[in-house]
Amino acid sequence: MAGVGAAALSLLLHLGALALAAGAEGGAVPREPPGQQTTAHSSVLAGNSQEQWHPLREWLGRLEAAVMELREQNKDLQTRVRQLESCECHPASPQCWGLGRAWPEGARWEPDACTACVCQDGAAHCGPQAHLPHCRGCSQNGQTYGNGETFSPDACTTCRCLTGAVQCQGPSCSELNCLESCTPPGECCPICRPGCDYEGQLYEEGVTFLSSSNPCLQCTCLRSRVRCMALKCPPSPCPEPVLRPGHCCPTCQGCTEGGSHWEHGQEWTTPGDPCRICRCLEGHIQCRQRECASLCPYPARPLPGTCCPVCDGCFLNGREHRSGEPVGSGDPCSHCRCANGSVQCEPLPCPPVPCRHPGKIPGQCCPVCDGCEYQGHQYQSQETFRLQERGLCVRCSCQAGEVSCEEQECPVTPCALPASGRQLCPACELDGEEFAEGVQWEPDGRPCTACVCQDGVPKCGAVLCPPAPCQHPTQPPGACCPSCDSCTYHSQVYANGQNFTDADSPCHACHCQDGTVTCSLVDCPPTTCARPQSGPGQCCPRCPDCILEEEVFVDGESFSHPRDPCQECRCQEGHAHCQPRPCPRAPCAHPLPGTCCPNDCSGCAFGGKEYPSGADFPHPSDPCRLCRCLSGNVQCLARRCVPLPCPEPVLLPGECCPQCPAAPAPAGCPRPGAAHARHQEYFSPPGDPCRRCLCLDGSVSCQRLPCPPAPCAHPRQGPCCPSCDGCLYQGKEFASGERFPSPTAACHLCLCWEGSVSCEPKACAPALCPFPARGDCCPDCDGCEYLGESYLSNQEFPDPREPCNLCTCLGGFVTCGRRPCEPPGCSHPLIPSGHCCPTCQGCRYHGVTTASGETLPDPLDPTCSLCTCQEGSMRCQKKPCPPALCPHPSPGPCFCPVCHSCLSQGREHQDGEEFEGPAGSCEWCRCQAGQVSCVRLQCPPLPCKLQVTERGSCCPRCRGCLAHGEEHPEGSRWVPPDSACSSCVCHEGVVTCARIQCISSCAQPRQGPHDCCPQCSDCEHEGRKYEPGESFQPGADPCEVCICEPQPEGPPSLRCHRRQCPSLVGCPPSQLLPPGPQHCCPTCAEALSNCSEGLLGSELAPPDPCYTCQCQDLTWLCIHQACPELSCPLSERHTPPGSCCPVCRAPTQSCVHQGREVASGERWTVDTCTSCSCMAGTVRCQSQRCSPLSCGPDKAPALSPGSCCPRCLPRPASCMAFGDPHYRTFDGRLLHFQGSCSYVLAKDCHSGDFSVHVTNDDRGRSGVAWTQEVAVLLGDMAVRLLQDGAVTVDGHPVALPFLQEPLLYVELRGHTVILHAQPGLQVLWDGQSQVEVSVPGSYQGRTCGLCGNFNGFAQDDLQGPEGLLLPSEAAFGNSWQVSEGLWPGRPCSAGREVDPCRAAGYRARREANARCGVLKSSPFSRCHAVVPPEPFFAACVYDLCACGPGSSADACLCDALEAYASHCRQAGVTPTWRGPTLCVVGCPLERGFVFDECGPPCPRTCFNQHIPLGELAAHCVRPCVPGCQCPAGLVEHEAHCIPPEACPQVLLTGDQPLGARPSPSREPQETP
């Protein structure tokens, strides 16, 4: 009670003090009924008065609670008093009260673990238990802390006092994944130092780089994290870019030379030749000579190391002159000096003279009156001269510098046109206008034509333009000669006075003045980068721009990163360098993170959470400490526990303050739209985060949060207080890092950074045009500013410096040209001073200006011509000439006729010169004093009878012979081009050609492969040696001649032949004269026949029957008939009358061929290519010659029935059945079918030419089969190929080889039976189980059966007899079953799908794989590329599993290997695969045969041993076959290998045969 009352008393005293304070301020204390709880809305007082009454209310609440507790205790006391009053009083021992109970005297208890109490004399004496270790306190930094107390020495460390020791721990920081870290000020945990570690490389913050592992990724280091984006390759400036290792985008190939490297498009000057400019174009260096602008007429030589001459001096006559220095001149009357590359000359001053036409005396500079100068000509005093003006003759005289003239009649001169009217001088008329003799003029409408009147005839031609007096003249439209009124420079026309930039050299500023262009270098400002660049059309190099996120920034510009405004970027050297903006230090210790920097003091970031300013929150690690956020600063204090009215408070687990047991919970406060606020809880009203409220026992008190001053110049308004996370500038908000145009200053750019705005002038990129217009901020090329004036694009304006020019602005470029003028109506208009366009009020002719009507000497020919200006057109005419006194005068000075030489037929001849007369006149002329006299020529006699006079010639010449389009002279001999062993001779216009008749002059002559006649090894005959080139007659016959011919190598040799006599065509027999002594050829007593145009193409028989003559090209061409060689002796030869060649007398001896006697003269055919005949007991055979074939890829050479030579037919195909049986179709598909019946293997399904059937046998095993026999049906004939090579034809056994013409031929080659059928069918049977059927390409698309349809597509080979595709190979094979076989009617089993390896087991499959592996080994390696081995390997494994162990497995293996080798041979590859123990083939060694894997299909026999191998192979179109062959050097004859010399005699005549055949009983012609 005492305690409670004391507490109540203290509350009352405190309440009174508050009331007095409130009363002093004039307020009243409101009273509320006890037990009534006010709501949050009613308890919120307005204004400052309510805030002042707030503490009073709190104390009133506490006082009311204490009074209520006193009331309850009072009731308990009254109850105890009544109990005590009923008890008897006994003396009691003193007691103590503690922990809610009474303790007897001397009792000891512990209110807590470190405090002990003892009851003495009714009082509790409590004290600390310092002797216990865990009850000792702690002291740190001068501060004392109790046991168990938690404190924080700084914001990042939490400590606790336990048993006298302080235990501290830092904050829980996450692990960092970086190389370097740092702890920012005010933070507890370290962060990664700005920068990125990527792929083992350290990059600074903000830098942009390419990934080292993938160059197509562009990465940026932002906030210690790497962000990568795929690069977009720009379009390549070259047509063939190259992708280099380590690069993403293809680049243009550069150039390397002499240790230097240049990029594509880069230009440079070679060190040794400054005038040589080279350029790199995709790895190739192209060089050209620099074109130097003509800046002055006499520039000084280039400075050392430079190319172009300079105008700071003059180089003249091989000497250098400085500017201003005198220069020597060829004119002594002028003084010249050098002026900046030009020579300026001034005439020497002359005194005045008293005459009007003073003349110049040679050697003097000034004119004097001792002579006259008139119309550009010099005359001596007292000299008389004549002129022609306006068609009249004028006589003038010179008298002391004065000229007087008078008209005079002209003498009559011969001219082409007679004079008319009163005009006495010869005149010309052209286009209705008359011109005097010698006048020159330009006809109207033809400005580039000049005419002159000569001998009364106008002669016009193109005007010869003089050299222009300027260096860059222009050819005006419609003008004849170039003009210096404008300049043509690098194919561009510029007006006079125009300034322009050279398109080829943009760093040259040029000026056009009077047709000459002068250029000077442009001064470029210095650049701030190491590698400046020059763009197209730019003069000066500039630093490259930067491209970042598809935005362009100029060099030196600072800007915000387009995607991250927290980064500041700067463009340098074409690369954007970015880094985080520096953050200002926050004015508080725990600011909130802003957009870029942690500087928002409107709240606190503490312990990983964010709190608004004014918020109270528990300490993140000590629940007994309470923290408060005040403008970014955090203050944490230990919770203060209020005194409790109960004697025994209870400390609940997890709580910081003890509580009275069963004490009623303080009343909470309602919150709109949320749960009730607890007692002593702070909260913000909904929608008003800037106010802070406190709930105390159901009452709510609120106040506005205070705002600290913002540490920035332009803060924006935050939720409650101004914030530096952004800017408020001129009424607009901007994000931190944002750039924006200044709203107050034009052309300025502002940056918002952490609440402050800074503005600076906008950076401008240099304009890409020479005359940019003034833009709003920067110059742009949308218009032009020219000489201080602004113009719009496409606007025309007058040139401010040249009133006659008109300029055009186009995209910042200004082009000025001459103002267009109307074309004048005259040929030589004049531009008066102050005017822009020409007029016809005067004339300007070749730099000379004259008034209308004025006459002056022609500037082009001042000696011989005068010109007059007539209304803007100059009319020029030649001065008159005196008449010539000779009939053939030549032109003299001024083209006047003189008699010093002769002019004949348009050519001038000197006096006394002799020359030919006119063409065809046959005259010889002579020039004498202007007169020409001619006499007729006399032709010399010719020694030939045939003479011809050509057109244009005077005299005839001897005519030779024309042969093969070439003329040969009379008596010449030559070898015709088409026959090297013939000789032709020309005699009296007749060409006679015959084969050279050879004779021998030695015992052993030799004949080379290219010699026509045999030669003797040396030039010696009958003991006499002859020199090279010497010829002689070897015997008494004058027609025989020998010649000693030199040889290219070795000594000379002797060649002898009979002379060739010319043909005496047309000579009558009565006029034939025999040859005289020592003469060889007869002659004709009269002239031979002439081959005229009427006889062209006709033939004539000469007296010699060995010649045939034909009239060709006006020449008789006589050819000697070739006689065949005779086999009979000379004694049995005779020449029939009227014949040329001898023949053998008919013999009676017969021939024996193949055991058959043949009569002499009888002929027979061996095969389609070879025919034989019997002559004089000898068999002669002749074979047809076949031309070589060139077939396409889908065709091959093949023989048709009845033909000798092959022709191009579709390529043949083959089908094979082998093993257990596997079928490879014509189209290449491999099938497996094990039926043991008879089946159609291949058949001609269109015309029924053939049908091949196979009969399979299971050999006593179930589910397997092998080919047992083959039946070939040819019409009515049936051929069966049985086991062990047996063959029957129509049921009868036959011996091989077997021939039944013309259909069938069967032979045995080795162990293989080969059947040839007339339609081109071929069947190969090994006598065991393998059969191969080959058909020519003509059967493409016509076959059916197990071999398929031969249409080139393997996918549709499973077609049954009805033409339908069947679903399985077993169904397909069964559909072609036929009812026949080895034993008709025997039982057979249909094919089904089986797998013999599954039944045989794993071991059998493994052994089969091992043995069949030879197909994939080296013996067959060359074939793998052309024939895949996998199908054959699978078939081989299948067969070995089916065959089982033993010798049958060896046969199955050889079948599969032989099948694969056969396909390899057809593909052109011959594998060598047989070995001593692998599939050995035996051949009859006793008959000389050996085995050959790829033997010739047409072996060497006695009948074809003389045929070249290449021709023999070309005739036998089948590829090589394995079998028994004769070794090299032996030939086959009657199944034996014998030497060629042991063959019987067989004579072959005619052309060389290509494919001679053996006897019919051995082998017929092979067909594919």
Swiss-Prot record:
Q: SUPFAM superfamilies this protein is in?
A: FnI-like domain (SSF57603), Serine protease inhibitors (SSF57567)
State what protein this is by name.
Kielin/chordin-like protein
S-S bridge residues: C1215-C1347, C1237-C1388
Q: Can the keyword Glycoprotein be found in this entry's annotation?
A: yes
**GO BP annotation list:** positive regulation of BMP signaling pathway
**Region: Disordered, residue numbers:** 27-49
Give UniProt keywords alphabetically.
Coiled coil, Disulfide bond, Glycoprotein, Repeat, Secreted, Signal
Write out the GO cellular component annotations.
extracellular region
Q: How does the record describe its quaternary structure?
A: Interacts with BMP7 and, by doing so, enhances binding to the type I receptors that contains cytoplasmic serine/threonine protein kinase domains. Also able to interact with activin-A and TGFB1.
Indicate the secretion signal residues. Answer: 1-23
What organism is the protein native to? Homo sapiens
Domain TIL: from-to ranges: 1483-1543
Q: Which residues form a coiled coil?
A: 60-87
SMART domains, per database record: C8, VWC, VWC_out, VWD
| Location of the VWFD domain | 1213-1389
Any idea what job this protein has? Enhances bone morphogenetic protein (BMP) signaling in a paracrine manner. In contrast, it inhibits both the activin-A and TGFB1-mediated signaling pathways.
